[in-house]
Each structure stands twice: as structure tokens, then as C-alpha cells.
Amino acid sequence: MKSKARAVVIGGGVVGVSTLYHLAAKGWDDSILLERKSLTSGSTWHAAGLLPLFNMSYSVGQIHKYSVRFYQELQDETGMDVGFRKVSNIRLASTQDRMDEYLQYKGVADTIGVEVNVLSPQEIKDCWPLVSTENLIGAIQHPEDGYIQPADLTQAFAKGARDKGAKIEINTNVISIKRSPNDTWIVETDKGHIECEHVISCSGNFARKTGKMVGLDLPVIPVEHQYIVTEQHPLIKERKDKNLPELGVLRDSDASWYMREE
């Protein structure tokens, strides 16, 4: 393992490996990523992989727009399938307040250049035949949205980062992070230490532990969610047998759930 680097990224999930890739793409090829186990072994392996273009912030919306475009470009660059499926994303509104929020967002989306369609209950039914529209006011739909496979995306990022000169060390546990007298960082691991200019924590569930190494108390805790996989519905099987398009990602913010085809 190298003993000096411009930047050390801690955490081998999709966020960490994406960070390493983009550093290398900007010319910071003297960067290294440290992962305590294997890539995607934290939260990434079971993430839903949704690509929500929806965001009320103009700047964050630009990042989302970039990401959806970039994932397709990454496939071409690395030759690795990231599981990108442009199936659209439909957000349901069962209250007028929620529908007003979506209509306000459409103004932001139009400014960013993100395509958004406003759907009536009947149009929702046309897109998603299994949806009960009885209590719905409407919805918005992002035709360019969809989902990716997070583990596949991470491996594509890793290949792209390595191709650009960056290094990845798996099965490497970070023990401490300290400031040196010459104002660099010393990252101590169970395989030795690395001196670097910058440390980027992308440690997910371990963010609080990593923060304490530099004297920060990060109010971050893991939250358990429910993940349900159902048997295949006859209508969905029929659609697949007929080679019809995959149904879009469906979201209900008021009921706090989302779903997509597996």
C-alpha cells in the first residue's frame, strides 16, 4: 500500500467510489480509497438504486440531472453495465397540498431543463394499471428517471477510477486520523499509514466513528427500513410476456413508500 497520496477516501460504497472516480477524472489520480471489507459491503449492496430527479433545490437538481446522464456515459466508458433502466418515476398526490408542491416543483424543473409531466388520475391508471386512483388528485412523472443497480454501478466506478490511476485498498481498516506537524493528515490503518493532503469520509453507517477520529460529533445513525419482495403479479408477467415496457417507479410521499419492478 502506498504511503503518500493527495487524497484518501474512506469507504467503498457507491458514494466513496464515485468520489474517487471524480477526483481521478479531475486529475487527482494520486488518490486512494480505503474499504474495511469489500466494495459495496455496507449499505450499497441492498440500496434500491432509485434515481429521483425530484428536488426543490435548483443546485441539487442540477446534480441529479448530471447523474442520470452520467450513468449512461459511464457504461460506454467502462464497458460495464450499471443496470440503468429509464422506466420513468411517478409521484402520487392524494392531497391538494401535495399536488401544489409538485406543481411548484415543476417550475423549478422547467428552469433546470428536467422534463416533468403532470398526470390526471386517468393518466396515472394508463401508466400503472394496478394503481387505485379513487383517492388521488393527480401525479407528476419524470420520463427520464428510473433506477440503477448500485453494486454494479460501484464496480463500474471502481474500474473507471483505476483506469485513471487511482488506487483502491479493500480489507483495510482505518484506525485513526491525525494532523501532522507539517499540516498534512496521517491516516493510520491496519496495513500501515498514509500521509495525505485531504481526507474524505464516505463511511456511511460508520460516519460517526470516522468523525470522532478528527474530533467531530456527527449526529448520524443508521435507520432500519422495511424491504418487501412480492411474488410476480399476473398482469406484470403478462406485460413481460408481450415485451411491453417495464412499469415506472411509483412513489407515494404521503404514505411513505415507493416500489418498482425487480
Feature locations, PLM:
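Dinucleotide-binding Rossmann-like beta1-alpha1 core, especially the glycine-rich loop
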Residues: 49-127, 247, 254-259
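Active-site acidic short loop of glycosyltransferases
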Residues: 4-5, 189, 196-197
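Beta1/beta-strand and adjacent pyrophosphate-binding region of the FAD-binding site
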Residues: 1-15, 32
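Glycine-rich FAD pyrophosphate-binding loop
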Residues: 24-45
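Flavin (FAD/FMN) cofactor-binding and adjacent substrate-gating region
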Residues: 73, 85, 94-170, 175-183, ...
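Active-site substrate-recognition segment that forms the wall
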Residues: 21-25, 49-51, 73, 80-88, ...
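Conserved phosphate-binding and hydrolysis motifs of nucleotide-dependent enzymes
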Residues: 11-16, 191, 202-204
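Residues forming the Rossmann-fold NAD(P)(H) cofactor-binding site
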Residues: 17, 155, 208
